[in-house]
């Protein structure tokens, strides 16, 4: 009898829903930070897109993050393996040669670059270190990938993800592709698993995506104590259907990974208590960016007021308003005598120089 079936998966989905609710604020902050990064932050501070006022977006915050990313790229770490004792010297030398080759093969420089962009924006980056069984024509090898924190779910209130009883990573997979990968999962009834993004928060992108043709595939990691030893177990499922379970795999009798640790590593910028995620430079600098742009908005609005003069016109004035408003007209007709009370310029006072200097 299978140890992991529909009942266990349904309970896991209930746990996933609780974990998602626990990190809802973090997910919204990450999505909002991406808008600030793309200089589309006016909508994030409550301004409607139909507002006719100027909405300048200076790149002060953007340039600050770009400079910090350049500093990080100038200091890419390299593995240095040192022996703990004399008998380890030969192994340390071998690892010193092997690890750089693995990192180069995994494209670590790009992973490091992308991870630092994410870390600067959101305060944390997450790296997945897993075993890829398809690498080297099926021989398998270590794989390193960046994981989007929007897709990762852990127990609310813990600071180290290793303390979480369960860990979920959710990916969206096209239904047809899923059927090609696991034909026994859906069978002929390809619509039997509901589509859509129930658990994953979405970025506000320019692309129009159809998530109804995608389904959520969940990587579920959890820990069990067997014979006094903690073991890491793994289950991949879609809907309430099990794709793979390490508990039902005889080759994983000692656990999915022998080190019994989750394959996700969090790297935090500014630490927060009660969560494995930190906060980033956008969280610190967004108010300063907002003040810069709001002051620029005031200056631009006042510049328009100063350059485009407005006038008071008496209701029964002799001035032809249509001709007066049309700057192409060289002549403006009036009926009768034109007095000073018929039309008067609305004076706009110059801005205080202290605002300009700020």
Predicted regions and their residues:
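Conserved small/polar residues in nucleotide/adenosyl-binding loops
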Residues: 356-358
């Amino acid at each position: 009898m299978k140890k992991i079936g529909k009942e266990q998966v349904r309970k896991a989905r209930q746990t996933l829903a609780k974990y998602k609710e626990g990190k809802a604020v973090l997910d919204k902050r990450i999505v909002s930070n991406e808008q600030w990064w793309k200089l589309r932050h006016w909508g994030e501070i409550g301004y409607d897109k139909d507002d006719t006022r100027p909405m300048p977006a200076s790149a002060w915050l953007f340039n600050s993050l770009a400079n910090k990313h350049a500093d990080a790229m100038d200091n890419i770490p390299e593995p240095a393996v040192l022996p703990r004792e004399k008998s380890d010297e030969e192994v340390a030398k071998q690892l010193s040669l092997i690890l750089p080759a693995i990192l180069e093969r995994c494209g670590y420089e790009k992973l490091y670059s992308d991870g630092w962009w994410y870390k600067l924006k959101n305060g944390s980056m997450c790296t997945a270190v897993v075993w890829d069984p398809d690498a080297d024509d099926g021989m398998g090898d270590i794989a390193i990938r960046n994981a989007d924190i929007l897709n990762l779910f852990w127990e609310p209130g813990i600071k180290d993800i290793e303390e979480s009883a369960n860990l979920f990573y959710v990916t969206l997979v096209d239904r047809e592709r899923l059927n090609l990968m696991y034909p026994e999962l859906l069978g002929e009834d390809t619509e039997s698993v509901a589509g859509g993004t129930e658990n994953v928060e979405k970025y506000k992108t320019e692309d129009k995506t159809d998530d109804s043709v995608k389904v959520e595939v969940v990587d579920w990691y959890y820990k069990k104590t067997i014979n006094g030893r903690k073991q890491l177990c793994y289950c991949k499922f879609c809907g309430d259907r099990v794709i793979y379970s390490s508990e039902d795999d005889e080759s994983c009798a000692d656990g999915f990974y022998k080190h019994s640790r989750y394959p996700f590593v969090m790297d935090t910028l500014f630490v927060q208590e009660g969560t494995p995620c930190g906060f980033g430079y956008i969280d610190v600098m967004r108010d300063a960016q907002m003040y810069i742009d709001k002051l620029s908005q005031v200056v631009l609005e006042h510049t328009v007021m100063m350059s485009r003069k407005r006038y008071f016109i008496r209701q029964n004035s002799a001035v032809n308003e249509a001709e007066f408003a049309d700057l192409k007209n060289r002549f403006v007709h009036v009926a009768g005598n034109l007095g000073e009370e018929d039309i008067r310029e609305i004076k706009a006072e110059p801005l205080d120089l202290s605002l300009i200097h700020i």
